[in-house]
């Protein structure tokens, strides 16, 4: 049986992992074994948090809409119900931006729905 020397392949693989973990704290950026574990963990965290980010932003938009709607005399639930009854299709991101940057349009939306 001939001897297999994997010098270049193994070195490239290890250098690739260490390049990814550059900037990690402690031995996670210098030792291959811990760096590999931390890199796999980091990828799992990033996948999980990409999904969580969508939930967090939707919740933030709802909080902002609710705050402005309560300021104008309705709560979030009533406001969204009135919008859907009036068949106005506008997403929550846009509604929250209207509440922050253009409160006159947002208040006109509320006044239209009350009638």
Swiss-Prot record:
A single Gene Ontology biological process assigned to it is: ribosomal large subunit assembly
Please give the coiled-coil regions recorded for this protein: none
What this chain does, per the entry, is described as: Binds directly to 23S ribosomal RNA and is necessary for the in vitro assembly process of the 50S ribosomal subunit. It is not involved in the protein synthesizing functions of that subunit.
Please give the superkingdom of this protein's source: Eukaryota
Which PROSITE patterns does the record cross-reference, listed alphabetically? RIBOSOMAL_L20
Its keywords, alphabetically, are: Chloroplast, Plastid, Ribonucleoprotein, Ribosomal protein, RNA-binding, rRNA-binding
Q: What is this protein called?
A: Large ribosomal subunit protein bL20c
Primary location: plastid
Gene Ontology cellular-component annotations: chloroplast; ribonucleoprotein complex; ribosome
Please give one Gene Ontology molecular function term for this protein: structural constituent of ribosome
SUPFAM superfamilies assigned to the protein according to its UniProt record, in alphabetical order = Ribosomal protein L20 (SSF74731)
As for family, the record states:
Belongs to the bacterial ribosomal protein bL20 family.
Q: Where in the cell is it found?
A: Plastid, Chloroplast
InterPro entries assigned to the protein according to its UniProt record, in alphabetical order: Ribosomal_bL20 (IPR005813), RIBOSOMAL_L20_CS (IPR049946), Ribosomal_protein_bL20_C (IPR035566)
């Amino acid at each position: 049986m001939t001897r297999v020397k994997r010098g270049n392949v193994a070195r490239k693989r290890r250098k690739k992992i260490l390049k990814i973990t550059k900037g990690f704290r402690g031995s996670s950026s210098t030792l291959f074994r811990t760096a590999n574990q931390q890199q796999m963990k980091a990828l799992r965290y990033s996948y999980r948090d990409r999904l969580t980010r969508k939930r967090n932003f939707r919740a933030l938009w709802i909080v902002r809409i609710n705050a402005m709607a309560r300021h104008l005399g309705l709560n979030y639930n009533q406001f969204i119900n009135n919008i859907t009854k009036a068949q106005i299709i506008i997403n929550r991101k846009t509604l929250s931006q209207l509440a922050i940057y253009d409160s006159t349009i947002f208040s006109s939306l509320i006044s239209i729905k009350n009638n």
